[in-house]
Amino acid sequence: GYVSNILHDRIEIGDTIEVAPPCGEFFLDVSEKHDRPLVLLAAGVGITPINSILLTSLDAFPERDIILVHAVLNEDVQAFRSSFDALAQKNKNLKVYYRYSETPFISATNASNGFVTAEYLESILPGRDADYYFCGPQPFMVALYHGLMQWGIPASQVHFEFFGPRQELERAA
């Protein structure tokens, strides 16, 4: 991104830089009690903050049911797959699914071709009442936000990281 390019292009070893703590609002609040399942949805590099939320939840709420869906072009560009598979083996309350938009061959039983849509989620979720966290490219975000709003999911159960003003996402949906 913008800051990464500046760091690589202008900062030298030994330089001092001033940083501030993270200012984001996309995190799992571990001070609250969580009775509903946690649904984590990511496309592409949107998996990075979702991975952090997953690890936080497994640590803070080891009995909570978690469904993780990661959408990417194909298996070759999928980050964290071996980690997610290992976590699912270790945590029976964690279900992991992969969606590939460009792969004709899929080697895993928990993987399928297509996009992450409300219809797809309906086929894998035990029910709609859950806490939803999602991050990814704009078309992914718009489709999920629109689908969750159509389902009548309360805003308090919908959490996302959108790279742009929230109003843009709401207008697009």
Label each residue range with its predicted role.
Residues 28-29, 60, 150, 172:
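Short amphipathic alpha-helical leader/targeting segments
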Residues 56-59, 63, 152-154:
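Classical protein tyrosine phosphatase
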Residues 43-44:
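Polyanionic, low-complexity intrinsically disordered segments
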Residues 1-40, 53-59, 73-74, 85, ...:
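FAD-binding FR-type
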Residues 33, 61-63, 126-127:
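Short, flexible coil/linker segments at domain boundaries that flank nucleotide/cofactor-interacting
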Residues 66-173:
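Reductase modules of NAD(P)H-dependent flavoproteins
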